[in-house]
UniProtKB/Swiss-Prot annotation:
HAMAP family: INV_PB2
An MF annotation (GO) of this entry: RNA-directed RNA polymerase activity
One record GO biological process: symbiont-mediated suppression of host cytoplasmic pattern recognition receptor signaling pathway via inhibition of MAVS activity
An example Gene Ontology CC term for this record: host cell mitochondrion
Species this chain originates from: Influenza A virus (strain A/Hong Kong/1/1968 H3N2)
Protein name per the record: Polymerase basic protein 2
Cytoplasm listed as a keyword: no
Biological role stated in the UniProt entry: Plays an essential role in transcription initiation and cap-stealing mechanism, in which cellular capped pre-mRNAs are used to generate primers for viral transcription. Recognizes and binds the 7-methylguanosine-containing cap of the target pre-RNA which is subsequently cleaved after 10-13 nucleotides by the viral protein PA. Plays a role in the initiation of the viral genome replication and modulates the activity of the ribonucleoprotein (RNP) complex.
Gene name tied to this protein: PB2
Family recorded in the similarity comment: Belongs to the influenza viruses PB2 family.
Amino acid sequence: MERIKELRNLMSQSRTREILTKTTVDHMAIIKKYTSGRQEKNPSLRMKWMMAMKYPITADKRITEMVPERNEQGQTLWSKMSDAGSDRVMVSPLAVTWWNRNGPMTSTVHYPKVYKTYFEKVERLKHGTFGPVHFRNQVKIRRRVDINPGHADLSAKEAQDVIMEVVFPNEVGARILTSESQLTITKEKKEELQDCKISPLMVAYMLERELVRKTRFLPVAGGTSSVYIEVLHLTQGTCWEQMYTPGGEVRNDDVDQSLIIAARNIVRRAAVSADPLASLLEMCHSTQIGGTRMVDILRQNPTEEQAVDICKAAMGLRISSSFSFGGFTFKRTSGSSIKREEELLTGNLQTLKIRVHEGYEEFTMVGKRATAILRKATRRLVQLIVSGRDEQSVAEAIIVAMVFSQEDCMIKAVRGDLNFVNRANQRLNPMHQLLRHFQKDAKVLFQNWGIEHIDNVMGMIGVLPDMTPSTEMSMRGIRVSKMGVDEYSSTERVVVSIDRFLRVRDQRGNVLLSPEEVSETQGTEKLTITYSSSMMWEINGPESVLVNTYQWIIRNWETVKIQWSQNPTMLYNKMEFEPFQSLIPKAIRGQYSGFVRTLFQQMRDVLGTFDTTQIIKLLPFAAAPPKQSRMQFSSLTVNVRGSGMRILVRGNSPVFNYNKTTKRLTILGKDAGTLIEDPDEGTSGVESAVLRGFLILGKEDRRYGPALSINELSNLAKGEKANVLIGQGDVVLVMKRKRDSSILTDSQTATKRIRMAIN
């Protein structure tokens, strides 16, 4: 207040104003400060000062011919003064207004295309709904969020090449457009932006917004998808929040969401197969999300989620160095530890072999609904500061931290035996055994933990074993805070290794991720996920397995048929028949398999008993390890639609219906496709008709390699010999004729020779 009075006093003296306004500033330091470098030192002041002048803007001389000297109100729009140091004229802001209202119109067709992200944002806001404002304490935590809705996921380098190719196609410089998405986008944009008059620099800038994911590390309390982040300033303040539902979705959020669902499904499925890592890779490579290959999305998309990171690790990509436990992401912020195997006794006197971390360490824990800071020493929790959305979330974080601390009182709180198993029926490792046990019921754990008196610290409060807050007492070392803990901000990625059982380790051998950490939450994907791998057939239930298995046989009939006659064991062991086994009652799988294999062998031995329909129908039943028995079956049971349904060995049934005339297969009333066979297969003169131009030499001769199908014969050179599979599943040796003249006689002799060769 005193200072202000003093200044007022000074200003009232006549000389002061004169000195301040007229005197030159000649102190070198000040001149240097404000004139060195191109960077404006005080932009807002500069702007205000400029706009206070009459003609703060410069324009091209042509403006004087296109804009009148005065507007309708008689205000001057431009000055006859030239701009010092350029041949431009000085213009009033009013000239801009005049130009916007009365200036020439150009084609606006390219605007929505170039400024696509802005137009779409306006649409989303127009159709969005803003709800009531609530005043409450906001627990915000900084998270890395996507601030740019509606973008593709190109890397900066890929985008740069696309932009150069679209905007400056004639510029020199090597540009390599390799990825599918780069080529598609380039083609699309070149067509859209033909004859575009908008400045190339602007187009380039807008394209960048469309192609590259931009992330910022921002304090967020609610939704983190990009359509929520674009209105962050409208939906949450320090002490208020406004409910908001976006008026539209954007593909990048949908890709992130669908990628997580696909990755979870794949990891869960791979974990229960014989070779999890190989299965996982097979599935990632054969899956598409919204029409894009999943492996391409994984390479470009920075989403960090347990299942997604396991898939990335399997592909040899780098991932974040934080590790996951109990659904929380742990990041060590200080300290270090060494690991030692120890045997510990639970309260039930069960022995657990645990890798104990020896040493003092501090971690941040970030989960979906709670965050915490954890300080621990060897098998001792020193301090845990938690904040969460509600009591339940806080409790979850406390349980995870208590188990992670490996404290004795936690191990002694175990009641009953620990025998949790994963989806593949393998026992979980001891740390996850403990976690599951206490997640089911933490009462004893909290009761046995111990409580202490607490000091009154701003923003912190105690929590009792029954999860009620208290200002006097708290569970030992544990406090609840109003402030959230920020997510780990670094985008650094590290090289990791993955073992056969999908455990991901960093280069020091610490386990960062394992299938146990993959969430069981089921969601509905926003984009269509197409799993081409047979391993994922069961994701839509038993009927889908049934239909997919038979469709696979029909689609691959040519190769299946050859294998059936030449190498049946290899055919029976195909992974495509694996899902089908779960439909056959366990007790009888072996007998069915033995029965079908014997039946097939008879077909191979006895001429003329080859039956396409029957082979297709019974093939999946031959996949289980066979039990030798004398049992005969007239029908085979499969468990679909909640009960056992029968497939007849001879003839059609509601489950399997094959129409011989149309060659259409119907499974449970659903169309399962049409069998495309060799022409005329199954008619009597097949062999003679098809083998015109070939000489039949006799029985199959293994030296000439595996049997070809009739369609493949055309590739033979004249005089070349080959084994060929003919209509009834029999194999004969043929030679392509050297002369074409004798083709006619082949038809008659072929039939006789085949009979002889086979018999």
